[in-house]
Amino acid sequence: MPPHISIYQHPQEKGYGAALTVIGSALWLLIILSVFLQKNPVAALIALVIYGLLLWVMMKFMAALFRAWMVGSMVVLSEQQFPELHAIFVDVSRKLGLETAPEAFIYNSHGVMNALALRLSRGRYVLLTSALVEAEDNAQLRFVIGHEIAHHVLGHLNSAKHFIRYPAFFVPFLYPAYSRAREYSCDAVSAFLLEDKNQALTALQMLACGAKRLNYEMSPSAFIDQEKLMPAFAGFCREIFLSHPRMTRRVARLMSLFPIVAVKPDRAPSSAQDAA
């Protein structure tokens, strides 16, 4: 990970990650210890190894099936297919320290705006929904793409880490808190790449709004002010179960990190090339 990227990690991400690692490791040790306390520890250990191998084979097979679905039902970005978007992926990946860009796909989401980063076996992937590409312009898409690639760069999809931490995922509220910190980290890393930080604010706000015709009329400051309307206790109770912070907080945090003057864009895209 490039040093200039790591400084944008949320302070709580490392703490929650360390807690997951420690608790997960301790629980794995307890599981192994319980095996050796059985009446026939050798048989129990063999059974554990067999179940582990079966699970590993099943996960590999499911990953292969999912990739087959992506290749057969989605559109792969390349130099020949949507070269402008593909160039953004390559440029963002290079700036974040990846020699090879993740394989990128666009799929028909039937109106759902989303993007996600995946790690299947050793392959890195980023998926964009059609609704997202339709609603956001190229600068906003650069932010979304940077956010998803940051998940790969910051090690959020590391299989070994997930395995060690897996038992701790069942500790109430711990994994969601860690996940929310990761989202803040990726927002900051991606915003760092943009010359116009306002594009990061509006890109996030578009995920809440979703209306293409309103893209160039959004006010991030007004959006952040919605936090004043949030019932404190209800807002807290809702968020502690979520993997992502609420959007108003994500926009507010970016404004606190970067010298952003939140303004509404003064023009709409002048051509089809400007629009995503």
What are these regions (language model features)?
Residues 130-143, 180:
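Short pre-active-site segment immediately N-terminal to the catalytic Zn-binding motif
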Residues 139, 149-165, 195-198:
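Catalytic Zn2+-binding segment of zinc metalloproteases
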Residues 224-276:
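Pan-zinc metallopeptidase signature
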Residues 1-112, 172-173, 267-276:
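Hydrophobic or amphipathic, alpha-helical segments that drive membrane association/targeting
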Residues 154-183:
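Post-HEXXH active-site segment of zinc metalloproteases
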Residues 107-124:
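Catalytic zinc-binding patch centered on the HExxH motif and its immediate surroundings
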